[in-house]
């Protein structure tokens, strides 16, 4: 056990109840937790092989149970990690993991754009590939990582979708941004999905990812806290910021002009032990950015 783990174990008896009280208040609300409206086709943009589970995993499973065709497009090749394995070994292992996750979450198809992990770019080639995917699937909902995020690939994926939708004026569906590294301020969430019946499947899917060096407990704990946003409380929920095409484009364009360095500004929310730090690091700035760029569609 390294020094970091020893320190976390030492402070946990104090940190855990304090975290529970503060985040219990932070996520206290009277929102309506909903079941998904029935849709036919869903497209999920996942920069990395686990984002589809960490963010909207319970909601996707609910779509599948309702009969929707869920198509997941992974943007990167999955070749980067804190690991002793080669890039080729990692890519093969992660695709095997996704084969298992596909069955657990009920995904109809999985495809790969194969951009280098950590180097996602919105290029003419990637835009044309995404445009073709959207035209083929005709999704009523597109799930995408947020522009405001601590990982450059998550921001770049939002930009890629925004750039693509600028050239697709006939797209009438909605875009749901889902949380990964940076939890949404509760005031920014405009769709709260009750995933109590699907949470066990989400947990099962996270347990598939042996290739991942990070912990997942913080992501899953946040689903429990977000249940407190509902009145009456639900066991677990996933929160989204939903936009129409024009609103999503405006949101991304405005943030791009601001030229913030989000990886330096925010911390990943993957560990329960560090949730307070991760959620409240530059929280006022994050909340203000959502307020200034808000014109969502519900």
Q: Could you tell me what each predicted segment is?
A:
Residues 78-110:
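Glycine-rich phosphate-binding loop and adjoining beta1-alpha1-beta2 segment
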Residues 55, 93, 125:
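Short, conserved clusters of charged catalytic residues that mark active-site
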Residues 2-45, 103, 109, 116, ...:
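Metal-dependent de-N-acetylase/amidase catalytic core
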Residues 75, 112-115:
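Short glycine-rich catalytic loops that host catalytic nucleophiles or stabilize transition states
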Residues 37-88:
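ATP-dependent adenylation/pyrophosphate-handling site
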Residues 60, 99, 203:
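Short glycine-/small-residue-rich flexible loop motifs, especially phosphate/cofactor-binding loops
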Residues 22-25, 62-66, 93-97, 107, ...:
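Short acidic/polar alpha-helix capping motifs at helix-coil junctions
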């Amino acid at each position: 056990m390294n020094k970091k783990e020893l320190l976390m174990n030492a402070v946990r008896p104090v940190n855990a109840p304090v975290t529970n009280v503060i985040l219990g208040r932070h996520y206290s609300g009277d929102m309506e937790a909903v079941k998904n409206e029935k849709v036919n086709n869903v497209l999920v943009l996942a920069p990395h092989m686990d984002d589809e589970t960490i963010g909207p995993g319970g909601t996707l499973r609910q779509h599948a149970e309702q009969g929707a065709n869920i198509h997941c497009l992974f943007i990167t090749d999955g070749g980067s990690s804190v690991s002793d394995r080669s890039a080729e070994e990692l890519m093969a292992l992660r695709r095997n993991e996704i084969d298992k996750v596909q069955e657990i979450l009920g995904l109809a198809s999985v495809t790969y754009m194969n951009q280098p992990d950590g180097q996602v770019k919105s290029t003419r080639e990637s835009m044309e590939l995404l445009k073709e995917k959207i035209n083929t699937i005709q999704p009523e909902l597109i799930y995408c990582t947020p522009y405001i995020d601590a990982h450059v690939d998550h921001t770049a994926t939002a930009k890629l979708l925004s750039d693509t939708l600028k050239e697709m004026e006939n797209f009438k569906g909605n875009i749901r941004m889902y949380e990964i590294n940076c939890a949404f301020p509760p005031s920014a969430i405009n769709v709260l999905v009750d995933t109590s019946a699907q949470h066990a499947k989400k947990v099962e899917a996270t347990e598939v990812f042996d290739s991942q060096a990070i912990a997942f407990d913080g992501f899953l704990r946040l689903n429990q806290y977000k249940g407190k946003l509902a009145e009456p409380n639900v066991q677990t929920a996933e929160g989204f910021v939903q936009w129409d095409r024009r609103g999503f484009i405006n949101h991304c364009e405005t943030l791009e002009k601001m030229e913030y360095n989000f990886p330096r500004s925010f911390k990943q929310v993957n560990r329960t032990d560090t949730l307070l730090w991760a959620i409240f690091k530059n929280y006022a700035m994050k909340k203000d950015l959502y307020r200034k760029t808000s014109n969502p569609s519900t």
